[in-house]
Amino acid sequence: MNAPVTPKKLIKGALGDWEVVIGMEIHAQVTSRSKLFSGASTAFGAEPNAHVSLVDAAMPGMLPVINRECVAQAVRTGLGLKAQINHRSVFDRKNYFYPDLPQGYQISQYKSPIVGEGEVLVDLPDGETIRVGIERLHLEQDAGKSLHDQHPSLSFVDLNRSGVALMEIVSKPDLRSSEEAKAYVTKLRTILRYLGTCDGDMEKGNLRADVNVSVRRPGEPFGTRCEIKNVNSIRFIGQAIETEARRQIAILEDGGWIEQETRLYDPNRNETRSMRSKEEAHDYRYFPDPDLLPLEIEQAFIDGLRTELPELPDAKKARFVAEYGLSAYDATVLVAERASADYFEAVAKGRDGKAAANWVINELFGRLNKEGHGIEGSPVSAAQLGAIIDLIADGTISGKIAKDLFEIVWGEGGDPRAIVESRGLKQVTDTGAIEAAVDQIIAANPDKVAQAKAKPTLLGWFVGQTMKATGGKANPAAVNALLKTKLGIE
C-alpha cells in the first residue's frame, strides 16, 4: 500500500486542497523480428507499406498465427513485474472503425489477459520509495498510421505498424502526483529494457502512455476520470497531468462536474482538449476471436523463461550497495540503464567501488550529458577509466592531473599510463623538490605565514600555491604534511 497522502502531494485550489489520482496504461512495442500474428518485419523506418502481409492488410481468408516469441516476451515482462502468469488466456476482437485498422477490429485480450496482478517499486527524487500495483498486462495488435501531410486534400494510410505486437501494461490508480507518474514510467521503461522485451524508444512511438487522471478531496471516493491518450514523452506526461488536474479542479470549484472522456494533450499550448466521450467496454462489443484458440501456457515454459531472466534493477541496486559500499542514490543512478551498470562493474572490478562510482557518475556521466552521448557512445572505455583510477591509487598521478588525463583520453584516446609517461604527467613525490617549492612560497608570503597559526584555514591557500608552482604534479599528501610542519599548524 502507498503511504498516506502528504501535503506536498496535494494541489492547492481556490477553495481548498485536492488530491490527484493517476492510473497509467503503457503501450510497449514488443521487441521481436516479426509481428504478433504474421511473419512481416517489424523494422522501423521502412518505406510506407513495405512490411505488410496479407494478414496485416486483412485480405479475405487470411488467418492469424500467434508468434511464440511475442508470447515469451510478454511472459518475461510479467515475471519482471513480479506478476501472476495466467496459464490460459484468450484473444478477443475489439470492434471499432478507423481508417488505419483494416480488419475493422483489433485483436486484443479482454477478460482473460496473459498476465495478471504484479507491482513495481518506484524510487522518487526525494528518496521515498512507493509501490505501484500492476492490474494486468495483455497482448494486442498495433494499428497502422494515418498520414495527413502528404496531400492537400487526401489522407494516406501506412500499414507497416499494423499488426505489430504491443503489451498494454495497466497500473492500478496508485499514483498521486505528476512526479510519481514520471518516475513510474521511467522505472517501468528501465525494467523493460533490462528484460529486452521493449526498447522504450518514445521518439519512435515504441512506448506510449495513456494517462487516467481524476481529482478528489483528500479521503473522499475517486472522482470521474479523464483519459489523456498517446502521450509520447516523460516530460509531457508530467505536464499533461498537471494541466488536466488544474482543469478539473477549476470546473469542480466552479460548481460543475467532470465528464468522463478521452482527451489529447497539446504541448505547444500546454492544454488538454476533448477528443471523444470515453467508451465503455460494451461499446467495443468484445467477443473471443473465432480464428484463435485460447492460449495455453505450460508451467515448464514459464519456469524456463524465469531461469533466463537477467538481474533486474532492484536486485542490482541492492547488490551494488552491499558489494561496493555505494550509497542508495549512487546505486540508483548507476542501474538506471543496463549499459551504465555494466560499464560501472567493468570499471569497479578489482578496484575501490566508491572511487569507480565517483568517476563514472561525476566525470563520465557529466561529460556524456554535456556532449549529448549515451554510455554506448562513450569515447572513454571502461578499461581506460579503470587505468586512470589505478594511476591515482598507485600514486603515479594526483586527482587534478587525473582530470586532465581524462580530457586527453576523451579527445584523443590512447593508453592512460603511456600518456602519463610520454607527457611527463607523473606526480612529483621527491620530497626535496616539493620542499623547494614550499620554501619558495613561504619566503614570498611572510604576511600570510604570520597569520597561518591563528588561521589554519590558510593552509589551503598555501597548498593551492604549491600545486600551482609544480604544475599540479606535487603529491598533495606530501605538500600538506610539509606545509603543516613548516607553518607550525597542528
UniProtKB/Swiss-Prot annotation:
A GO BP term here is: translation
Give the Gene Ontology MF terms in alphabetical order: asparaginyl-tRNA synthase (glutamine-hydrolyzing) activity; ATP binding; glutaminyl-tRNA synthase (glutamine-hydrolyzing) activity
- Catalytic reaction equation(s): L-glutamyl-tRNA(Gln) + L-glutamine + ATP + H2O = L-glutaminyl-tRNA(Gln) + L-glutamate + ADP + phosphate + H(+); L-aspartyl-tRNA(Asn) + L-glutamine + ATP + H2O = L-asparaginyl-tRNA(Asn) + L-glutamate + ADP + phosphate + 2 H(+)
Sorted keywords for this record are:
ATP-binding, Ligase, Nucleotide-binding, Protein biosynthesis
Query: Could you confirm whether the keyword Transmembrane helix appears in this record?
Result: no
Under PROSITE patterns, the record lists:
GATB
Query: Pfam families, per this entry?
Result: GatB_N (PF02934), GatB_Yqey (PF02637)
Q: What is its EC number?
A: 6.3.5.-
Q: What class of enzyme is it?
A: ligase
Q: What does this protein do?
A: Allows the formation of correctly charged Asn-tRNA(Asn) or Gln-tRNA(Gln) through the transamidation of misacylated Asp-tRNA(Asn) or Glu-tRNA(Gln) in organisms which lack either or both of asparaginyl-tRNA or glutaminyl-tRNA synthetases. The reaction takes place in the presence of glutamine and ATP through an activated phospho-Asp-tRNA(Asn) or phospho-Glu-tRNA(Gln).
Family as reported in the entry's similarity comment: Belongs to the GatB/GatE family. GatB subfamily.
HAMAP family recorded for this chain? GatB
Name used for this protein in its record: Aspartyl/glutamyl-tRNA(Asn/Gln) amidotransferase subunit B
| The organism of origin for this protein | Methylobacterium sp. (strain 4-46)
